[in-house]
Design a protein with these regions (language model features):
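Short, Lys/Arg-enriched N-terminal segments with co-localized hydrophobic residues
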Residues: 1-10
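Acidic-glycine-rich active-site phosphate/pyrophosphate-binding loop
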Residues: 12-22, 55-69, 243-262, 294-312, ...
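A structural signal for small-residue-enriched, beta-sheet-centric alpha/beta enzyme cores
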Residues: 13, 32-36, 63-70, 74-77, ...
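Conserved phosphate/anionic-ligand binding catalytic regions in large, soluble enzymes, centered on
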Residues: 31-47, 265-282, 323-327
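Early transmembrane hairpin of solute transport permeases
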Residues: 39-138, 142
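Hydrophobic alpha-helical bundle architecture
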Residues: 49-51, 77, 287-300, 310-376, ...
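Flexible, glycine/charged-enriched surface loops at secondary-structure junctions
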Residues: 55-59, 100-105, 127-128, 204-210, ...
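Signature of multi-pass transmembrane helix bundles
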Residues: 117-262, 427-434
């Protein structure tokens, strides 16, 4: 594709890669209500109830450690403050609409909230850790008299690989998430091509998804700043100043304040995470307001930021002991740099500098402190950019930093996916009092 952009510069991007990047954005930037892991439980439970054909009297919930970690402490939306695994499953059984996928419990009625609570009080929901090689693994079996239905989700929040009823396999597919076309597409991501794509993309190809991200994520950030949610990190930040850096951190944190506390507003996610979707987008949106840039510049900055976040997470994986906000905050710094006219060298240095600062932050599940980690990660993204402007950088050999942005990204992926496996196990043991 050859497209003339502002100033008459012509840039080319392979047609296949262009369409791949568009499709990645369409697949990743989808709306979800509530923290994604509990919603995945609700979705799985709702699907199993549909297969069973009646409300179950018993439930067996078998889940991987990272699902336990990310559901244990978070409030399930539309449940009047119910928290945890059993609440997410009960909400899916009583009020879920599996056809709405990650918005499965978006339309819970008031009388259904009481039904959810009654169900939790009068029915047996057994939760067991699942011995599995998959970081994200959900297996829910629902029983009623002599009938049962089972649904299993693996590797991605909506990836159903097995449906069974009364010993009959209704649906089964070999799980090829690690080798399928979608993940191969993500492996084609690299910083240089992402920047080129952001410069030349026909905005008609991405306008719908980016405009939805702006609208949804801005709305929940405003909600988080207006009302009392979690530890109110967004409001705490704004109480200390109103400069643009503080606002960028505060709006991202405020969205997380609300989301982690069960706010019913949807969020456009990134890499399977609402917190990451807000972290990468809201600082860029705030800077665009400050700089009074046009919509086109904002959209291109968000395209860049979202794809850089996805690029980093592709190597780390959906769930890890590595805090995903770090990747998203780094990507936000890149989007902000783009608003100022950054070139490839600037973007590359922003990434390396940022990752050198905050890559040690752990993920200990979804809960109110995520908002503070988001603020720290956004701050690192902005600092990484400002370091470059001042001629400063972290150099080859400074810890995990090596020469070349792609090499440093690979090191971080290795750290998050392989190096922190034992850390992840210990975090889960601590959180489950084992």
């Amino acid at each position: 594709i050859i497209i003339t952009i502002e100033g008459g510069i012509k840039m080319a991007l392979d047609e296949i890669k262009y369409q791949t990047y568009v499709q990645i954005l369409k697949e990743e930037l989808v709306p979800a209500m509530g923290c994604t892991e509990p919603i995945a439980l609700s979705y799985c439970a709702s699907k199993a109830r549909d297969i069973l054909g009646t409300t179950p009297t018993r439930c067996l919930v078998e889940i991987s450690g990272n699902i336990i970690k990310n559901v244990k402490s978070v409030i399930v939306p539309n449940t009047n403050g119910l928290k945890g695994i059993e609440a997410a499953v009960a909400a899916g059984i009583i009020a879920g609409n599996a056809n709405k996928v990650l918005e499965v419990i978006a339309d819970v009625k008031k009388d259904q909230i009481k039904e959810i609570k009654d169900y939790l009080e009068h029915n047996c929901i057994i939760v067991r850790p699942l011995e599995t090689e998959h970081i994200l693994d959900i297996k829910i079996t629902l029983f009623d008299d002599d009938n049962y239905a089972m649904v299993r989700i693996v590797d991605q929040h909506t990836n159903i690989i097995s449906i069974e009823k009364n010993h009959r396999v209704l649906f089964s597919k070999e799980n090829k998430i690690c080798n399928n076309e979608m993940v191969i597409d993500r492996c084609s991501l690299n910083v240089k091509d992402i920047l080129e794509f952001a410069n030349i993309v026909d905005l008609n190809d991405v306008k719908e998804i980016i405009s939805r991200q702006i609208a949804y994520n801005s709305a929940i950030a405003k909600e988080g700043l207006t009302n009392n949610y979690g530890a109110n990190i967004g409001s705490v930040l704004l109480n200390s100043g109103q400069d643009i850096i503080t606002r960028a951190k505060a709006f991202a944190a405020a969205g997380s304040d609300a989301r982690m506390s069960g706010c019913e507003l949807p969020v456009v996610i990134n890499s399977g995470s609402g917190n990451q979707g807000m972290t990468v987008s809201l600082p860029i949106i705030e800077y665009a307001k400050e700089l009074n840039v046009n919509d086109e510049k904002l959209y291109r900055a968000l395209v860049l930021g979202n794809l850089i976040a996805i690029h980093q997470k592709n190597g780390i994986g959906r769930l890890s002991a590595y805090c995903g906000a770090v990747s998203a905050g780094c990507a936000a710094g890149c989007g902000i740099a783009y608003l100022y006219g950054a070139d490839y060298e600037c973007i590359a240095h922003t990434i390396v500098n940022s990752l050198a600062i905050t890559s040690g932050i752990i993920c200990d599940g979804a809960k109110s402190s995520c908002a503070a980690k988001i603020a720290a990660s956004v701050d690192a993204g902005i600092l990484g950019y400002k370091m470059y402007l001042d001629g400063q950088e972290f150099k080859d050999g400074d810890g995990i930093v090596v020469k070349g942005v792609e090499n440093t990204i690979r090191n971080v992926a290795r750290l998050g996916k392989e190096g922190m496996k034992e850390t992840d196990k210990e975090i889960i043991k601590i959180m489950t009092n084992c």
